[in-house]
Structure formats: C-alpha cells, structure tokens
C-alpha cells in the first residue's frame, strides 16, 4: 500500500492532467489532505473510524468548507482504489453536508468544431504525432472516455470490425463503449503509423502516454485552434460529450452507461445543460400546451373581429 505523501503527489498530478486544476486549486487540495492526515493519521491506511473523527474536528467549520474537505478526501480515496493502491474506500464515514454541486465546465459545439478542424488539418500531413492526437480527441469527445481509461487502452480493446471498445473503468468495472465511424477511421490511420510492439494503443517509451502529456497536448492544440487553453482539458471534452449527447435527446440511463457512472445521481448533473430545450419541448409538444395555444389564437381572432 502506498505511503500517503506519495499517494497525495500522484493524486495531485492526476488533478492537473485530467481536470486542468490550477496551481491554487492544487495547493488547496494539498492543504485539505495534509490537514486531514494530521487529524486522522496516514491517509493511505486510514480506516473508517479514523475518518469519522474528522466530522467532529470539523464541527465548527462552515458547511461549504466541510463539503470541500470531504470532497477532496472522497476524490483521493476514489483515486487510490482506481489506481489499485487500495482495495477499500473508507470515505463513506465522512460527513455529507447538503451542498449544491457545481455545474460541469463544457465547450460549445462551435468550440469543439474549431478544435477538431485544427486537429484534422494537422493530421492531413500523415505525420505520426498529429494522427495520434486526432485519434485521442476522437475517443475523448466521441466516446466520452476518462483520461485514465484513454491513455491506458490496450490494443486488444479495439476489435477490427466491431464498433465498440472494451473499457475498464473505475473499480475495475468493464463496459462496452461505441466508437463512431470518424473515430474508427482515425484509429485505423494511427494503427498504420504506430509502429510499436507495445500492448498499449498509445505507447510511450516506458509504457503508455501519461495523463499529464495528454493534458499538455490538448492545451497546445487549443492554442493553435485559437481557443482559450484554460477551457480545454480531457475532463472538459468528456463533459462536452455528455452535454451534447443529452442536448441531442440521449436518455439519461444510456448516458450513465456510456460514462461508466455507478450511480445515476452522478449523471443527473448534466440535466442542467438542456433546461431551455426541455421547456421549449414541453411548450411545443405537450397536449395541454397545444390546447392553450389554440385558445389564445381564438381569443386573438375575436379581438380582431371586435
């Protein structure tokens, strides 16, 4: 089992790579985790009783502060389990003050198009790195993969003829993820140039490309596409995948399966994105709305006659 200090460093590196966390954000996570460790002992080995004592220690803090500290720990333990550094997750012992969840950051359709147009222009050179980058973003936005899932994909996860990937997500749970025709073409182009005996689809000298490198490549692509690099990250492209699918009419349960969420409540945060469309849909399609519109039309005609 990893020592807490090393595990914290790995966790912070993941936040920077997958979520584009700024230096101040990373410093806040570090303070929360190290503060919790001072109260509960070694976080990497801490059990539920030790974590339950944190609730008492935080009793004088504002609910928002408690929620932030508890969230940092839940994410930390989720990361440890995800990376195989720990088998159990003791974070259920942490307090859960009632707080509204922040809305996920995303990109507009036009911003995604600009990002892809730039990547496609660069891939036309048939040079390996631009072709690889196009394949990466096709899978991020086209299949909604987590950064960790994407960079660690084995070659065996990509069947030649079936339009699906076999992805191992959080907790070692496998799921089937559909791959678009565009993504398959990009993958085929990359496989033709890959030139490696590595078992990984996106190999590096040691194993596979890292989340940090994927994060850097997306930032660099955003700059070349004349987009704000602060708005672009693997995490944001995954959110864009979910947001745009929901806008297009995808069922929330289907979206839950595609994203690999264990709990539908995690997926429900995306329902905010389509509120305007849903209101318009009810106003236009609901039988009573149509009836009310008919009455308004009749009243308008009577006023005209008068």
Swiss-Prot record:
UniProt keywords, alphabetically: Cell cycle, Cell division, Chromosome partition, Cytoplasm, DNA integration, DNA recombination, DNA-binding
One GO process term, biological-process aspect: cell division
Record's subcellular location: Cytoplasm
Gene3D superfamilies: 1.10.150.130, Intergrase catalytic core
Domain Core-binding (CB): 2-81
Keyword Cytoplasm: yes
Pfam families: Phage_int_SAM_1, Phage_integrase
Xref: PROSITE patterns: CB (PS51900), TYR_RECOMBINASE (PS51898)
GO molecular function: DNA binding; tyrosine-based site-specific recombinase activity
InterPro entries reported for this sequence: CB, DNA_brk_join_enz, Integrase-like_cat_sf, Integrase_catalytic, Integrase_recombinase_N, Integrase_SAM-like_N, Tyrosine_recombinase_XerC/XerD, Tyrosine_recombinase_XerCD
Coiled-coil regions listed in the entry: none
A Gene Ontology cellular-component term: cytoplasm
Domain annotation Tyr recombinase: ranges: 102-283
Function: Site-specific tyrosine recombinase, which acts by catalyzing the cutting and rejoining of the recombining DNA molecules. The XerC-XerD complex is essential to convert dimers of the bacterial chromosome into monomers to permit their segregation at cell division. It also contributes to the segregational stability of plasmids.
Family assignment from sequence similarity: Belongs to the 'phage' integrase family. XerC subfamily.
Assembly and interaction partners: Forms a cyclic heterotetrameric complex composed of two molecules of XerC and two molecules of XerD.
Stated name of the protein: Tyrosine recombinase XerC
Organism (species): Erythrobacter litoralis (strain HTCC2594)
